[in-house]
Amino acid sequence: MENKQCDHLTDWFSTTSDASESMDTTPPLPPPTPSVDPSYSGAAADEDLYSDISEGDLEYSDCDSASESDEDDDDCLIPSKEKAREVAASFGYTVIKTLTPGSEGRVMVATKDGQPEPVVLKIGQKGTTLIEAMMLRNVNHPSVIQMKDTLVSGAITCMVLPHYSSDLYTFLTKESRRIPIDQALIIEKQILEGLRYLHAQRIIHRDVKTENIFINSVDQVCIADFGAAQFPVVEPADLGLAGTVETNAPEVLARAKYNSKADIWSAGIVLFEMLAYPSTLFEDPPSTPEEYVKSCHSQLLKIISTLKINPEEFPRDPGSRLVRGYIEYSRLERKPYTRYPCFQRVNLHIDGEFLVHKMLAFNAAMRPSAEELLSYPMFAQL
């Protein structure tokens, strides 16, 4: 990147999204609202909350060639493959393919007599899958996956979802190259439009990542997999761990209070991965759920070290867990709110780098909302 651009970025990055450091507020929730059981807090124990640690959620595996261990993978949340196929058949569906299961249930591509278009069935225990289904039933936006139907058989809930050709992770892997800036901005705009809508409904997704962005084409993208979503959230709250460590925001990793700004951080990681493929900001993801929980501390240290977070970029609240636990690891060699040095190695387009930098503001109060980001010139002109 030319020095002229670097100087421009430094000036650009010295500004913040808002004059104040108060978290954004969202408008009241319009009816209808998800009818979630009042006894459900949505904040389970840390070790139970990592809802999806798969890579390439839409990677296909032949139904008849699945590993034997997969057959035995039926714990209290995931029905066995045979049971899931029986449930699908009882509703008139013929399973074509099985997809990588999440922790909430089996995922299968299926067709129904008289309906040639394939659909995706997400089949799981009623408690967890039904909560996700009730949430999706009450949302309606082109950038959020649309639930076609909810079917119940005993203790099993089956969600019927549209079938997309790929997820963004698989799309990037197959393309094996960076997505051009104009296409990446079109995709990111749809993601942010979906988040703006969800946040206005007081829903935070909590697991925005390339695996959970479904795509048919550059201009047909949606946010999917609401197994980790939380409702209702406006003010920062103690919501526990959820999602995926390498895309979690600092405040989530620190187990501090957080709100919708956590989704903005994750969407910033998605944009970076589109523009910098195959480079990633934070390498070496853990491989087991236990390692995910244990690695929150090391991941947060990695963020501070990689981005060279200045102490002035920490939240102003001295009682914040992020401040109390991690400000001692901050770095002084980089001035606050200036370009992250690690961006130099990937040579991002200036518009893309500006957006990623804004979305990866370490202090959530300085992170723009989806509404603010969509007002930026690079999106307004699309």
Curated annotation (Swiss-Prot):
GO terms for molecular function: ATP binding; protein serine kinase activity; protein serine/threonine kinase activity. Residues 1-75 are annotated as: Disordered. The active site is at D207 (proton acceptor). Residues 93-379 form the Protein kinase domain. GO terms for cellular component: host cell cytoplasm; host cell nucleus. Its main location: host cell. ATP binds at L99, T100, P101, G102, S103, E104, G105, R106, V107, K122. It catalyses: L-seryl-[protein] + ATP = O-phospho-L-seryl-[protein] + ADP + H(+); L-threonyl-[protein] + ATP = O-phospho-L-threonyl-[protein] + ADP + H(+). SMART domains: S_TKc. This is Serine/threonine-protein kinase US3 homolog.
